[in-house]
Amino acid sequence: ISSGGSLQGILESHDGAMWIDVPAGQPPRSAVGHIFGTQINLCWSLGLLPRMEEKELDGMLARMEKLRDRLDLVGGDGSMMGIARELHGQRLQIMSAPALEAMGYRCRTQLNENSGILATASILPELHHNEIVAWGEGDMQDNVQILLFVWNGMHDRVGLRVEWTLDTLQNIPIHILDCAGDS
């Protein structure tokens, strides 16, 4: 999967290789919709994943469009810009439920790369097993803000840990990012 260039040339010169085109001119991080959509459609077409029912797919796309419009930095409701302003110049800790670990990790890497700040990430309950001790040490709570990824499908025990975390770290600004969807 590429937008052409050298990779396309290499693949076209080999029998059995397949090249799948996506629009050119975008860095991978801004082309994620094209890339992911192409990958999922390929998996459906090859029978590697069961195809979503049309109603389910329409619901997912409608949710994504609504969120895109609400969270847009220019025309949205301002919530993302508000969080960005609060996070500016702060140390960032990303916490996530186990099912959202990859999302927390990706958020950390994007913040590190694109904002030039050092963000760290942890998952619940591992956070409470090892890391929670450090939160009580010295100045660990100074100039730090937390991004907490949760969703309605979390295990009940993880939900209890989230509540405990909110109570224990109540002096630290925590931004709860409630992820939408059923999967």
Protein language model regions, located:
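Active-site phosphate/pyrophosphate-binding segments
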Residues: 44-143
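C-terminal active-site/capping subdomain that shapes the small-molecule cofactor and substrate pocket
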Residues: 133-183
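Short glycine/serine/threonine-rich phosphate/pyrophosphate-binding segments
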Residues: 1, 7-9, 101-105, 129, ...
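Short glycine-rich or small-residue beta-strand-to-loop segments that form or flank ligand, phosphate
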Residues: 1, 90-96, 146-152
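A short acidic, often aromatic-flanked loop/helix-cap motif at beta-alpha or helix-coil junctions
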Residues: 26-30, 127-129, 181-183
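Conserved beta-strand segments of alpha/beta enzyme cores
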Residues: 18, 118-120, 173-175
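Glycine-rich phosphate-binding loops that contact phosphosugars or nucleotide phosphates
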Residues: 1-69, 85, 164-167
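Short, structured patches in soluble enzyme cores that scaffold and shape functional sites
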Residues: 24, 38, 96-98, 150
